[in-house]
Amino acid sequence: MKKEEREVLLREKLCQMKEFERELTENGICYIAGVDEVGRGPLAGPVVAAAVVLPPDFSLLGVDDSKKLSEKKREALAAEIRELAWAIGIGKREPARIDEINILEATKEAMADAVQEAERLLRERFGQEAKIGHILFDAIHLDGLETPQTSLIHGDARSVSIAAASIIAKVTRDHQMIEYAGQYPDYSFEKNKGYGTRAHYEGI
């Protein structure tokens, strides 16, 4: 496929993935957060959630479900998302908390923290009246939120905000697992990121 043809396809994909955000913006919603997590399946490491608020004119090509992207591509996109986003919040829950309350509840806590941090950063940037007007979640619902929310099945492949959050969450967690690799060299965390590969099982 020629470069020009690929770019056309990427622009079409981006247009499709902005549809949810576009509809909300047309209904008067100013700040829309996409939220996703990574780390619900590994044998080791934290669950990490990200909340990303993008400007309506966001036009970075290639943003997609982080699982569909190479590590090199995720790293490059994450750097650009951090430059372009209006706000990015991160939430984490470590293994001890996951064991205490279960992975789903730990994920929800991490997501709530990520949303709270993103909103705080919005206020710092745009003033105390700024607040998230709608939250797009990837296949999850958070109880107790006053902010309107939508849960999208396969949201990281359907919403650009959720996709951006999936990339930020993945890169953030990967960096933490690389740090863990220095502390626990037997488990190859720098390669498997805590997932159940053969090397990880052999380390156990």
Residue map of PLM features:
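RNase H-like, Mg2+-dependent phosphodiesterase core
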Residues: M1-I204
